[in-house]
Amino acid sequence: MAPSNLPSVFNATSQDIEMLLAAQCHLGSKNLQVHMENYLWKTRADGVNVLNVGKTWEKIVLAARIIAAIDNPADVCVISARPYGQRAVLKFASHTGATAIAGRFTPGSFTNYITRSFKEPRLIVVTDPRTDAQAIKEASYVNIPVIALTDTDSPTEYVDVAIPTNNKGRHAIGCVWWMLAREVLRLRGTIYSRETPWDVMVDLYFYRDPEAEAEEKVEEEKVPGAEEEGPAAIESGFAATGGDWEAPAAGFAGATGTGWDGAAGDEWGAAPATTEWAASAAPAAASGEAAKETTW
């Protein structure tokens, strides 16, 4: 499925195509913009439009060549207001040196020089033309080229390079941003050859739920067997103590000889005999009085 109008060095490998398919980059929406018909492969029976991943790869390479042509990497601004793309743009910026805007785009960042967030980038890359419409609109005012990840229903006004892909799934967004960063580093020479694999895993670009990460951290910090009940708790406690139920404790070693003997026939339920402490103290008191009466 490699495009024929690219030099052979830019052709996608089977692993790249399989990765795009595994991340569901080829699955679009049920709506179709007229400008996205060129990237359509077919429409499924359930109405979902399927994109041509060969053209997706072609546009990834084209976008990477545009980004690599800019001398100062900080002049490239990557933007994502969609939560699934915020982690991806931050990782892309850290690996390529671009400027990232993750979250809400402050209006006037490209047009109002009085604001603190004012920027003058030479190129912007957005995750979704619909959610990042403010950034695209301001870029059109100041003649900034725009690269966008576009779905079948995405508006393409003021978009100069459209990368056809699924821009709603977290795996698809992360996969495309990872491939774009890898191609930029290859063109810059950071990755020496195309046969050399990139040591950064694609999972690093995927969105992660903060609540799920907090729950996983709490689960890791829990004591093993703290929430177990019934036989499982008994077995875990038995294993923790070493499993030796026969060995008596050191404190009870001397008490075994003076313990209750069932053969003696004693009534263990009977009340204990009362100890008359006053009677035992009487002789001592009498001797004390006699000592007082003795005159030396």
UniProtKB/Swiss-Prot annotation:
Low complexity: bias regions: 263-289
Short name of any one Pfam family annotated for the protein: 40S_SA_C
Superkingdom, natural source: Eukaryota
GO molecular function, one term: structural constituent of ribosome
Gene Ontology BP term (one): ribosomal small subunit assembly
Keyword Mitochondrion part of the UniProt annotation: no
Entry's Gene Ontology cellular component terms: cytosolic small ribosomal subunit
Ribonucleoprotein in keyword set: yes
InterPro entries membership: Ribosomal_uS2, Ribosomal_uS2_C, Ribosomal_uS2_CS, Ribosomal_uS2_euk, Ribosomal_uS2_euk/arc, Ribosomal_uS2_flav_dom_sf
Subcellular location: Cytoplasm
Keywords: Cytoplasm, Ribonucleoprotein, Ribosomal protein
Region described as Disordered: 245-296
Subunit structure of this chain's protein: Component of the small ribosomal subunit. Mature ribosomes consist of a small (40S) and a large (60S) subunit. The 40S subunit contains about 33 different proteins and 1 molecule of RNA (18S). The 60S subunit contains about 49 different proteins and 3 molecules of RNA (25S, 5.8S and 5S). Interacts with RPS21.
Family of this protein: Belongs to the universal ribosomal protein uS2 family.
Its biological purpose: Required for the assembly and/or stability of the 40S ribosomal subunit. Required for the processing of the 20S rRNA-precursor to mature 18S rRNA in a late step of the maturation of 40S ribosomal subunits.
Protein name: Small ribosomal subunit protein uS2
Name of the gene: RPS0
